[in-house]
Amino acid sequence: MTAGAKSTAASPLPERVLGIDFFPGKLDDAIERAAGGGLLTAPSGPGLAYDLVREPAYRRALESSDIVLTDSSFMVLLWRLRTGRHLHRNSGLAFLRIWMNRDIMRRPGAALWVMPSEAERAHTLEWLRAQGFPAEPESFYVAPAYGDGELRDERLAALVRERHPDVVYLAIGGGVQERLGHYLRDAVGYRPVILCLGAALAFMTGAQVHIAPWVDRIGLGWLWRILSNPSRYSVRYARATRLAWMVFRYGIEAPPSRYTR
């Protein structure tokens, strides 16, 4: 069983940027399409600028995603400057705010939450219960520290097969969660909704800095993160500046890999 039926409306043609096919439609359309199951990713500016060229498994995960959201406001701006075309921005946070209001999320056992630490597991469990979601400790999995390259986590895959959730939420960070989601989609034997939205959940629960809807809407969530923890996020987002050169140099084409391992 999946989280809902697929939309019968014709899907808009994807917009290819740097070899990745982004979903160009409105957020409601993305949500309805995602409800049919599959892998949803929302690459950040730093992810596109760095991981896309340095981690082949990350690139493959994005290339094979069922839906890729236009989460990066910087990428959307660059694309408009390069092509003159308006690419509608759909952030992972805006997606999650709407998704959490779907009836499926109120069903016991419907979601499995994959968390980066025991502390975040406990915090998220408390928040979900406070919001009226039927979350239980058994609905969580604390991920180990994953390495580079293709990922495998048979313990997690077995848990998904056993519990058969409609939704698997991966909150373990960009660059890693996409590779894990790619593995899970092909390993579990059915088609749950796999949401690789990482920190979007932490923005809602308070585990990370709160990002108000208006801040997200104007594309300044990155600035809020930097201001909340400059030492942690300044270097990360500085990497995204390379995205400008990549978009203007390669356009729709995939940039060459700089894989060095």
Give the ranges of each region predicted by the language model.
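N-terminal nucleotide/polyanion-binding subdomain common to many enzyme families
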Residues: 1-94
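A short helix->loop->beta-strand "cap" motif at the edges of active sites that frequently abuts
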Residues: 37, 108-109, 189-193
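Short glycine-rich anion-binding loops that position phosphate/pyrophosphate groups of nucleotides
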Residues: 45-48, 172-177, 200-201
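Conserved beta-alpha
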Residues: 76-159, 163-164
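A transmembrane-helix-recognition feature enriched in membrane-embedded lipid enzymes
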Residues: 76-78, 210-261
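Short Gly/Thr/Asp-enriched flexible loops that form oxyanion-binding sites at enzyme active sites
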Residues: 125-127, 178-187
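Short, flexible loop segments at boundaries between secondary-structure elements
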Residues: 142-148, 190-228
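Proline-aspartate-enriched helix->loop->beta-strand connector
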Residues: 160, 164-174
